[in-house]
């Protein structure tokens, strides 16, 4: 809806005006939504700063004046098609939603995936959208970052010129209680017969400290050691030595409130046995302890490179503007960007081992197994659903 036009900008003109001024699509002009924030961004020559500010201010202040049922219905179908394409009709496409549902209780903001269910998308009314926009897309709930080749006093004057007249929105309602126990209490098991899957795959998710927790850097480094790159423990064991998987990796989501998810994934070879793959993955995770200084140093160096490399760009994901916005959004500190590397440097082997012993345990995990439909009969009879 944010690109469908506002009072002074027609449908599609946001992109066309920025592209005519030197911006490009993709990482230069886009919008994203994840569990904890929605962000919109553009990157273009510095002499076009006022154009970008005018466009953003116009849709923040006047989007509802151009919104109607036809636009809502159109965008509803766009999102439904995105769900079909990226989730429902993709091999293993439902893995995130299934692990979220297992690792976070019903009623928690992280219990559901970001894109929403088909039922929720169908039920969203024009009034729902208008009320949501009035509540959350207002100056008192927004972070505006201008970065790059700018004159700071002049940039601030332009911001005041275009945004000062937009009134505050209503008080943003506080989040429901997001606190959860450190441990989910028992192993959750889910087996999915997947008609799209070419091979079995096993996903093991753990509830871990959130990105706001002081242990968050240790979570990232633990995930790196176990599951990032060909030097990781999982790749070395499952792909290189045992040769039971074609890929093995880990993902840390960086969720902000209450808890986070650390997920390890192994994909088998076509025709291979899902039980053997699961057994091998769980065995490696059970041995996630006694990390070495070399492993810690390697993971820390990789994170340092990725972080510093991202800061070489002004826009895009992980660029300077993005990091400044993250700092204020999650920590109320735009200077947080200058603290990240120090936080990684302070993680010790004891921190990693303690975190693994506390969180990478059977009673704190959800095991999700995807079985290709043609292999299902031999397995489904013994499946225990949560």
Kindly label every feature range from the protein language model.
Residues 4-9, 61-70, 290-291:
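Short, polar/flexible loop-turn hinges at active-site or ligand-entry regions and domain interfaces
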Residues 325-329, 336:
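C-terminal, helix-dominated tail/subdomain
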Residues 9-48, 73, 86-141, 165-213, ...:
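Non-catalytic beta-strand/loop surface segments
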Residues 54-59, 157-163, 277-284:
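Short amphipathic alpha-helices in soluble, non-transmembrane regions
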Residues 261-293:
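Extended amphipathic alpha-helical segments enriched in small hydrophobics
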Residues 49-51, 152-156, 214, 271-276:
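Short, conserved charged micro-motifs
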């Amino acid at each position: 809806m944010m690109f469908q036009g506002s009072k002074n900008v027609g449908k599609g003109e946001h992109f066309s005006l920025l592209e005519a001024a030197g911006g490009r699509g993709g990482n230069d002009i886009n919008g994203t939504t994840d569990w904890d924030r929605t962000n919109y961004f553009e990157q273009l020559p510095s002499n076009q700063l006022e154009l970008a500010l005018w466009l953003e201010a116009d849709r923040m202040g006047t989007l509802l004046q151009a919104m109607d049922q036809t636009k809502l219905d159109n965008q509803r179908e766009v999102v439904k098609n995105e769900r079909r394409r990226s989730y429902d009709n993709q091999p293993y496409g439902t893995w995130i939603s299934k692990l979220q549902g297992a690792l976070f209780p019903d009623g928690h903001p992280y219990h559901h995936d970001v894109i929403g269910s088909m039922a929720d998308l169908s039920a969203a009314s024009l009034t729902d959208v208008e009320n949501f926009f009035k509540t959350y897309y207002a100056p008192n709930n927004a972070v505006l970052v201008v970065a790059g080749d700018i004159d700071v006093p002049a940039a601030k004057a332009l911001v005041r010129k275009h945004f000062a007249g937009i009134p505050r929105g209503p008080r943003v309602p506080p989040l429901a209680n997001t606190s959860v126990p450190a441990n989910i209490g028992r192993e959750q098991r889910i087996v999915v017969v997947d008609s799209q899957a070419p091979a079995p795959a096993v996903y093991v998710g753990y509830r871990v400290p959130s990105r706001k927790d002081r242990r968050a850097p240790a979570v990232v480094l633990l995930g790196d050691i176990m599951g990032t790159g060909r030097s990781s423990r999982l790749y070395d064991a499952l792909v290189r030595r045992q040769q039971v998987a074609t890929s093995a990796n880990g993902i840390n989501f960086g969720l902000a409130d209450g808890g986070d998810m650390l997920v390890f994934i192994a994909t088998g070879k076509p025709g291979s046995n899902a039980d053997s793959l699961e057994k091998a993955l769980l065995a490696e995770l059970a041995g996630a302890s006694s990390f070495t200084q070399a492993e810690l140093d390697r993971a820390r160096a990789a994170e340092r490179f990725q972080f510093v490399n991202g800061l070489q760009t002004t826009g895009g994901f992980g660029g300077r503007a993005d990091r400044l916005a993250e700092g204020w959004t999650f920590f109320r500190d735009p200077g947080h960007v200058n603290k990240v590397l120090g936080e990684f440097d302070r993680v010790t082997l004891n921190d990693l081992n303690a975190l693994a012993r506390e969180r990478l345990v059977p009673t704190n995990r959800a095991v999700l197994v995807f079985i290709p439909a043609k292999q299902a009969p031999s397995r489904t009879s013994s499946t225990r659903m949560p």
